[in-house]
Amino acid sequence: RSMLDDVSSLHFATKFDANENLSIGLARYNQAGASHNYQGAGSPLPGFSAVGPSTELSINALAVLGRYSMDDFSAIGGIKISTVADATADIFKLSGAATAASIEGGSDTGLVAGVAYEKPEIALRVELVYETEASFSLPTTGGLLGAATANTTASVPDYRTLNFQSGIAEDTLLYGSIRQADWSNHQVAVAPQTQAAPTSDFSDSTTYTIGVGRKISDQWSITASYKTEEATENTGTSLLSPTDGYEAIGAAAIYTLENGTEITVGVNYSMVGDKTVTSSGVSGLYSDNTVVTSGIKVAYNF
């Protein structure tokens, strides 16, 4: 059985044109999270099946964005509220804790800014977006704290994303993105640990995506994509960071109804990078692991 639990999330977004130059949008989505359960999972670390860590953490974002167009150029700006849901972290059994740490949720507000260039006659769009970091200080009880209270610290890094798309033939679109985040400076430290000895062991990431879309008919379109995140650290010390980069392939089909509603069904297959984790004096190799994700999107244009 996998030490990674199944995860489901619900996203929504809406956009409307205030006038011919200004558009306003609202989006809610899952920004980050961790869902691990080594207990009974057959961990490669000897003896950890009974006392290994179990965590459940989710960070959701609510973004309000505006876009102002000036001929072929546009400016993007807005705010993003990142919220950590109430969480649990059963990670101190090896240190003698009888209960899991209970972490109270919290939120932080950041900014989003970007610019874009468009050439509609060839479906060209190039967009550069910057998102500021979010930091959290979350009251925590249980675990090694017992009835006492201390703060768990966590943060989500600033993101720099370059998106592009362009028509390359009739009814055929090439698209892609590059996304960077300095995760090495944004660790999770479940109280009573500190950022000097964090719970996590995240590494900086650069993610590349390339894909192609094809319109088959007035009703049907298909897409295929390849995504990769560079491997940076094939060894680590945190059981919450058991992978090192990944490669993924994805495919989707889009069906458009007569009223303009679009229904998209997609699947993604990821091959995550191998990593050796050393914790409490023993080492385990995580290798040949895969992740399958699927999703359904419904969009209505009016």
Regions found by a protein language model. Give the residues of each.
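Outer-membrane beta-barrel porins/channels
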Residues: 7-9, 15-302
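Surface-exposed strand-loop-strand hairpins of Gram-negative outer-membrane beta-barrel proteins
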Residues: 1-5
